[in-house]
Design a protein with these regions (language model features):
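Autoprocessing Asn-cyclization modules and mimics
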Residues: 312-399
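N-terminal accessory beta-strand-rich subdomains and adjacent acidic, glycine-rich linkers
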Residues: 1-224, 549-550
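Mobile, glycine- and charge-enriched loop segments
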Residues: 211-240, 359, 364-368, 384, ...
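Active-site-proximal substrate-binding groove within the catalytic cores of carbohydrate-active enzymes
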Residues: 14-17, 468-601
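Short, flexible loop/turn elements at secondary-structure junctions
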Residues: 85-87, 98-100, 109-111, 265, ...
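Aromatic-lined carbohydrate-binding/catalytic grooves of carbohydrate-active enzymes
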Residues: 226-335, 412-438, 443-458, 462-466
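Flexible loop/turn segments at secondary-structure boundaries
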Residues: 266-271, 313-318, 375, 397, ...
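Carbohydrate-binding surfaces of carbohydrate-active enzymes
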Residues: 292-316, 321, 329-337, 343-345, ...
Length: 601
């Protein structure tokens, strides 16, 4: 018997064999599934077969086992589905929430009979991934890659995450697009949840808003509908209690309602980002946060809303996290095991693993063993594997002896100037840095910019938004909006200001606006047949607004330094025209009549 799930907006039918059979928009009766061959709604992926008989009969490789049967029992919140698969000798239990304007699917449990893996000492089932949703939909006029929504003037169909853990994606075909949501073992299988929205286009953002409120997500819809999202921002890297009045004067002269303060306004820095992570207050703040609070009160009193610009994943190579003892929570892109003891005077490091592909840029050739940082000149790619020409005690770290078998690694040095490295988001260091940022933010900031967001660990589609979210979650009060240097699916909920094209100096600013964000905006509107729309702007098709670039922002301080260079420490207040900085994002307003993209998908 088919499984029928119905809410106020749509009716979803899954066949008894596990395929999506129909998705009807109730207001019009439109069928929203592709007429192509049905696709299994659920599936499970294993790295190889583990059941002995399946392993012997089939190739040992990463394999997808599609659903081949479903049975349903109703629950107070919707339904509980028990799903079986081709060949895989177990079943999945999926909880379905039927909300008025969305359906949510969460992996609740597994049913593994004793006969499935007899005598094997292993965790069962050996699932690497579980597909929560697979939906084949026909192409529509627009596709928003960021939120994973296909829409036109009449209807919108979207598969999106209900928490930070699922991998959300799509695959375009000639006549259709496959929307998918997957729970991943290394992040979370049980409890991972994704949602399906099928709605009239005019009601789509309302449905997303319901999901955000029900699952206590950042309020992306509410933020995109606020007046603040459309305001220009005045940016400065050198606003302090001593010169804040001049900055306010320039901002008011330019008509700016928002002022974005780079973290160097508050904290000591040198050599690019070399001290990032310390968050030591500048001398101009003897009372630290209290001095910042009084300065921000002045900005608020002038009718300007202050925001904080920071790099939340960067750790400066001269910070206390790197020297004199490098923190074990710094991210290593490769791991190496010492094949011989490393004594204090040694300049050759012998390891068990092949260093092929290790960093060749001289600024990035840094190994970490224990608390010591070591640079190298070269390495061998045949046994014995060796790093040669090593300089011990780099960046003032303590030179030590290291025993055979000690595991170290290649430090994840930031590509932006190599004055910092990236922290490991799987450790407590991300939360430790978030606490420092939140303490400063609480002095009176109301929005923020997640700079350096691309500096995360793989899988990037999870860790880029999750690193932002771990900071966002600690900020009080919640930001009116945020911007970032990178985004992925879950960022949509908190990164309502989008991405900033933020490295261009004044002399080329207008040219770069035309080359990048101005080119991006109309591309967001194209029918994406067989191609992926970049980034993520699109939005409510019938809300009466369009989106373009946020108007050009100016600052009275020096222009933002290119990544990896030191912010200017000059106390001189330059005219605004000498320090224009781009904040090109997609928001809910059109930019001076330019071709624009819809707001916010």
């Amino acid at each position: 018997m088919s499984v029928v799930l119905e809410n106020d907006l749509a009716r979803l039918v899954l066949s008894e064999s596990g395929c999506a059979e129909s998705l009807i928009l109730r207001s019009t009766g439109e069928e929203c599934l592709s007429p192509a061959e049905p696709v299994p709604f659920f599936s499970v992926t294993q790295d190889r077969p583990f059941n002995n008989e399946v392993k012997l009969a089939h190739p040992n490789k990463r394999t997808v086992y599609p659903a081949n049967r479903i049975r349903m029992e109703k629950t107070a919140s919707g339904a509980r589905l028990t799903v079986g698969f081709d060949l895989a000798p177990y079943e999945a239990v999926v909880d379905v929430t039927v909300a008025p304007r969305y359906f949510a699917f969460s992996l609740a449990d597994w049913i593994v009979p004793d006969s499935a893996y007899p005598g094997l000492a292993m965790n069962t089932p050996p699932a690497a991934e579980f597909r929560l949703i697979a939906l084949s939909v026909p192409h529509r006029a627009h596709f928003g890659a960021w939120l994973n929504v296909s829409w036109d003037e009449g209807a919108a169909v979207c598969v999106l995450a209900a928490d930070p853990t699922p991998r959300i994606d799509s695959e375009p075909f000639r006549d259709r697009r496959l929307l998918t949501a997957d729970a991943v073992r290394e992040i979370r299988l049980k409890g991972s949840a994704a949602a399906l929205i099928c709605a009239p286009s005019a009601a789509f953002l309302d449905a997303v808003d319901d999901l955000e409120r029900d699952y206590d997500l950042p309020r992306g819809v509410e933020s995109r509908r606020s007046a603040a999202i459309n305001a220009s921002a005045y940016w400065t890297a050198d606003c302090t209690p001593e010169n804040v009045d001049e900055h306010i004067r320039y901002a008011k002269a330019g008509g700016f309602r928002m002022m974005l303060l780079y973290y160097t306004c508050l904290f000591r820095e040198r050599g690019g980002y070399a001290l990032n992570g310390n968050y030591d207050w500048r001398d101009e703040y003897p009372d630290k946060r209290e001095d910042a609070r009084r300065m921000l009160e002045k900005i608020h009193a002038a009718g300007i809303t202050p925001g904080l610009h920071f790099l939340h994943t960067h750790i400066g190579l001269d910070s206390r996290y790197c020297t004199p003892d490098a923190d074990p929570r710094l991210h290593k892109v490769r791991r190496f095991t010492l094949a011989r003891p490393l004594c204090e005077g040694d300049t050759v490091i012998e390891v068990e693993e092949d260093p092929e592909g290790c960093a060749s840029d001289p600024r990035c050739r840094i190994l970490q063993f224990g608390g010591e940082l070591v640079s190298y000149e070269s390495f061998t790619t045949e046994r014995p594997y060796r790093f040669t020409g090593c300089v011990r005690g780099l960046r003032g770290t303590t030179v030590r002896s290291h025993p055979r078998g000690e595991i170290g690694g290649l430090l994840d040095v930031s590509e932006f100037g190599a004055s910092s490295c990236y922290l490991d988001q799987e450790t407590s260091l991300q939360d430790e840095i978030a606490d420092k940022i939140a303490e400063a933010y609480s002095a009176g900031f109301r929005f923020c910019y997640f700079d350096g967001s691309e500096g995360a660990i793989a899988p990037f589609e999870y860790h880029i938004p999750m690193a932002q979210y771990r900071v966002w979650h600690k900020l009080t009060p919640s930001p009116l909006y945020t911007e970032g240097a990178a985004k992925a699916h879950f960022s949509w909920h908190h990164l309502s200001g989008g991405n900033a094209f933020d490295v261009f100096p004044p002399a080329v600013f207008k040219e770069m606006i035309r080359r990048y964000p101005d080119e991006e905006a109309p591309r967001m509107r194209r029918i994406s047949r067989g191609s992926t729309s970049a980034g993520g702007a699109s939005g409510s098709p019938k809300d009466g607004t369009t989106a373009g670039h946020r108007p050009i922002s100016s600052s009275s301080g020096p222009a933002a330094p290119p990544p990896g260079t030191a912010p200017s420490r000059s106390r001189r207040i330059s005219p605004p025209s000498a320090a224009i900085r781009a904040w090109a994002t997609f928001s809910r307003s059109s930019a001076a009549g330019r071709t624009s993209a819809p707001a916010g998908f």
